From Swiss-Prot:
Entry's EC annotation: 2.7.11.1
Active site residues of this protein: 320 (proton acceptor)
Reactions mediated catalytically: L-seryl-[protein] + ATP = O-phospho-L-seryl-[protein] + ADP + H(+); L-threonyl-[protein] + ATP = O-phospho-L-threonyl-[protein] + ADP + H(+)
Residue ranges occupied by any Protein kinase domain in the UniProt entry: 195-533
UniProt function note: May play a role in the regulation of metabolism and signal transduction processes.
Pfam families reported for this sequence: Pkinase
Residue segments, region Disordered: 1-167, 551-589
Example of a GO cellular component annotation carried by this entry: plasma membrane
Name used for this protein in its record: Protein kinase G11A
Keywords, sorted A to Z: ATP-binding, Kinase, Nucleotide-binding, Serine/threonine-protein kinase, Transferase
Species, as recorded: Oryza sativa subsp. japonica
Length: 589
């Protein structure tokens, strides 16, 4: 029975003026003394730490299993701690029963049950809710194939940073790491007191993002601040924990870097890379016609495809691709953000070999595609004309003459020596109802369970929106949009005109049956071989010139008010109060 529900506004941004800088550990993350721990171990007494030989083998066998099946969320609520094996926490089980909250229930043409039967939309008891364009849904539990988090991923520190945030290969030369290491060397720990919050950048479902400066340096970061009490009351602590765990394991040029994270009594903070170029949604709105040229689209989606490929190799299903979540760095390249809706699953990478006629033809001609940066023109990295055979090798000084050479036997259907890495978590299944209306895959709306194929559906919607300035199934309302996704065929507008390969790629990605969808079997490897990406040098894509480089950002600082020692300061007028409202919550720092 559906109920009419008003769309819920995003949570209020935390009042940073009320932040308390604490230097003690959070009471919710308690440790056990060695003497108490010894009393809890089978075969040991509290007086003696000598192990019982009869239970040593049992301890060794069970220790690894227990460590891999327990996830501490930092909450005092026992329901927030995952049980061992495939058991589902009570809180998550309760959320899954009402995972659809209020999206399909608002209509007058037909009853919800009739519409669900006609279009195959899954029904749910109780109230229903589906997130809007800027709102995200609740993350439910996944199948038993999903990999549980380990307790080692959770920091036991409160007001100081996690020691697990260390320099990673792709950011080895980042000046921001040097600034952070300098503060750590000087003070030992890194906490909220070391940052100055300058302005608010945006607000999401579980927190707000602020532009921050590391004190004593000119290094700027994006700090995501989450109110722990609000997360607990809205049952979103697990989502915040999932995002932190995913960010900790990422090391990719097109994915965010988690420099540090820390907690106070009230807030949980993630310190990440600041992207001054904004997001692709804002950038698209500034384009003529509100859509990108096809060459620019090819650049952006190629980098996103590599980021998605990396995530799937780690067993991470993103589930929230949209222009608002694609940020533009200062050099014009992109960065994928927001991982609170992501799903972590098991994956088995496979290395296979496949035939490649182009590579075989090059082998016969004694040539190869050059992989040296000095041999490639970066400005035309994604132009088809740049994909011409070349070689970095000089002539052989002691080669035999052609008369002395013996002809090599022709090999029919020879397999290319270039292997393909397939790492697609295709067996993952989740019943969660998460995402954005216009980007939801049909299998999510029908409630049939979904896996990694939903990322390739959203990738197709994303490609369509960048090319045409709108999504393909958008209706007059959220309810109509869902019905269009299920029952309406894919159509292309007459204008703007795009290439046949672009339309063909979108058709392959927006197949309503997930088993027939492009990328379902071989993942990003299959998509990268589509003619739309012809001429893209995947190995050197970071050397390509971006379509647009954002202008340098000038950081505006609040003016310092002079302090008079002779007369008491007068109360500010209403106009002055309104003009300085944007800085009031940062005065504390």
């Amino acid at each position: 029975m559906a109920s009419k529900a008003m769309p819920r506004a995003p949570p209020a941004a935390p009042n940073l003026q009320s932040l308390k800088l604490c230097s003690q550990n959070d009471s919710s993350l308690e440790t056990t003394s060695p003497s108490k721990r010894s009393a809890l171990v089978p075969g040991r007494s509290a007086e003696s730490s000598k192990p019982n030989p009869e239970v040593v083998q049992k301890e060794q066998k069970s220790t690894q299993h227990q460590n891999e099946s327990i996830d501490l969320t930092g909450s005092n609520d026992p329901a927030e701690v995952k049980a061992e094996g495939n058991l589902v926490p009570k809180r998550l089980a309760d959320e899954e029963k009402g995972v659809v909250e209020d999206g399909i229930a608002n209509g007058s043409l037909k009853s919800s049950s009739a519409l669900g039967k006609e279009h195959g939309i899954a029904s749910a008891s109780g109230s229903a809710r589906l997130v809007g364009r800027s709102e995200t849904g609740e993350r439910g539990f996944s199948s038993s194939r999903c990999r549980p988090s380990t307790s080692s991923d959770v920091s036991d520190e409160s007001a100081c940073s996690s020691i697990s945030s260390v320099t990673k290969p792709h950011k080895a030369n980042d000046s921001r790491w040097e600034a952070i290491q300098m503060i750590r060397t000087r003070d030992g720990i890194l906490g909220l007191s070391h940052f100055k919050l300058l302005k608010k950048l945006g607000c999401g479902d579980i927190g707000s993002v602020y532009l921050s400066e590391l004190s004593g340096t000119k290094s700027y970061f994006a700090m995501k601040v989450m109110d722990k009490a609000s997360l607990a009351s809205r049952k979103k602590l697990l989502r915040a924990q999932t995002e932190k765990e995913i960010l900790q394991c990422l090391d990719h040029p097109f994915l965010p870097t988690l420099y540090t994270h820390f907690e106070t009594d009230k807030f949980s903070c993630l310190v990440m890379e600041f992207c001054p170029g904004g997001d692709l949604h804002t950038l698209r709105q500034r384009q003529r016609g509100k859509y990108f040229p096809e060459q620019a689209v090819k650049f952006y989606v190629a980098e996103i495809l590599l980021a998605m490929e990396y995530l799937h190799m780690l067993g991470i299903i993103y589930r929230d691709l949209k222009p608002e979540n694609v940020l533009v760095r200062e050099d014009g390249h992109i960065m994928l953000s927001d991982f609170d809706l992501s799903l972590r699953c098991a994956v088995s990478p496979t290395l296979i070999r496949s035939s490649n006629p182009d590579a075989e033809a090059l082998r016969k001609n004694n040539q190869a595609y050059c992989v040296q940066p000095a041999c490639v023109e970066p400005s035309c990295m994604i132009q088809p004309s740049c994909a011409t055979p070349t070689t970095c090798f000089g002539p052989r000084f002691f080669s035999k003459s052609k008369k002395d050479r013996k002809p090599k036997p022709e090999v029919v259907n020879q397999v290319s020596p270039w292997p393909e890495l397939i790492a697609e978590p295709s067996d993952a299944r989740s019943m969660s109802f998460v995402g954005t209306h216009e980007y939801l895959a049909p299998e999510i709306i029908k409630g049939e369970g979904h896996g990694s194929a939903v990322d390739w559906w959203t990738f197709g919607i994303f490609l369509y929106e960048l090319l045409f300035g709108k999504t393909p199934f958008k209706g007059s309302g959220n309810r109509a949009t869902l019905f269009n996704v299920i029952g309406q065929p894919l159509r292309f507008p007459e204008y703007p005109v795009v290439s046949f390969s672009a339309r063909d790629l979108i058709r392959g990605l927006l197949v309503k049956e997930p088993q027939q969808r492009l990328g379902c079997k071989r993942g990003a490897t299959e998509i990268k071989q589509h003619p739309f990406f012809e001429g893209v040098n995947w190995a050197l894509i970071r050397c390509a010139s971006p379509p647009e480089v954002p202008r340098p950002v000038e950081i505006e600082r609040p003016p310092k008010q002079p302090v008079s020692t002779s007369e008491p300061a007068a109360a500010p007028s209403d106009a002055a109060q309104k003009s300085s409202d944007s800085y009031l919550e940062f005065d504390f720092f």
